[in-house]
Curated annotation (Swiss-Prot):
Keywords: Cytoplasm, Hydrolase, Methanogenesis, One-carbon metabolism. Pathway: One-carbon metabolism; methanogenesis from CO(2); 5,10-methenyl-5,6,7,8-tetrahydromethanopterin from CO(2): step 3/3. It catalyses: 5,10-methenyl-5,6,7,8-tetrahydromethanopterin + H2O = N(5)-formyl-5,6,7,8-tetrahydromethanopterin + H(+). Its main location: cytoplasm. This is Methenyltetrahydromethanopterin cyclohydrolase. NCBIfam families: one_C_mch. Its EC number is 3.5.4.27. Belongs to the MCH family. GO terms for molecular function: methenyltetrahydromethanopterin cyclohydrolase activity. Catalyzes the reversible interconversion of 5-formyl-H(4)MPT to methenyl-H(4)MPT(+). It is an enzyme of class 3 (hydrolase). It is found in: Cytoplasm. Pfam families: MCH (PF02289).
Amino acid sequence: MLSVNLASLPIVEDMINRKEELNLEVITLENGATVLDCGVNVMGSFEAGKLFTKICLGGLAHVGISISGSLDNKLVLPCVKIKTSHPAIATLGSQKAGWSVSVGKYFAMGSGPARALAMMPKATYEEIDYRDEADIAILCLESSQLPDENVADHVAEKCGVDVSKVYLLVAPTASMVGAVQISGRVVENGTYKMLEALHFDVRKVKFAAGIAPVAPVIGDDLKMMGATNDMVLYGGRTYYYVKSDEGDDIEKLCKSLPSCSAETYGKPFLEVFKEANYDFYKIDKGMFAPAVVTINDLRTGKLMSYGETNVEVLKKSLKFSQL
């Protein structure tokens, strides 16, 4: 059985060994847990964002960063590229931000390998038939605050490991690492929608790849939450190899997956969020999806694609001006 925690540990150790190069800070808490500050009190870096994203994906994906000129010849943004041969485990079993970590006054959205020990949420792991077994727990936190010993103790208890074997990586939304890792969810947005909104068995997805632009750091966490989500919703492109069964309507799946199928399509995410009174649960689940979806049905040999990138919404989201 693949272990997302054990597969991610060498990446964590690499980040610790290269902390100065990556502009990170490593903190050992009094209870022995290790905290990696990837953007709260430090600058972080794109390379750190790449490694942070690989850890979010449980060490089961290749992550790269490049400049893509295919969106618009005037709007040039770096892009994060993802590919994985274990889509269900890497994206839903690890990367999905499925753990709301709330301890005292501390709150963060948790993603990454430790979720597969704590089974957060349990229903997801039942759907993909996966659970990790490891004596270490690695959790990625999206927060503008660093966790303390109480948070580490909470994670250790939920994961069933000694607190000295807990690694907590922290990056605010409004940071380079935060921007990279959110765009790095481009494949996961598709598998999440397959499972949660379309009730498709994601274990049939045998390989997945995706690319999405990375948002510039343009303001506080709220503004960045809007911009980072828009990168995937209006700029993300994904490719899925699906081994269908008789009776699976893969063409319908492909048409239903992209963000353009949502009623709120065409508006920057922050605008939609405001209209929902800043309540994620009031937002159409269909909006959390890549802009373009291509599916290769391995059973039938058919190749199909639906959706399109929307550069105008990206420019509006970023308040981009061509000088």
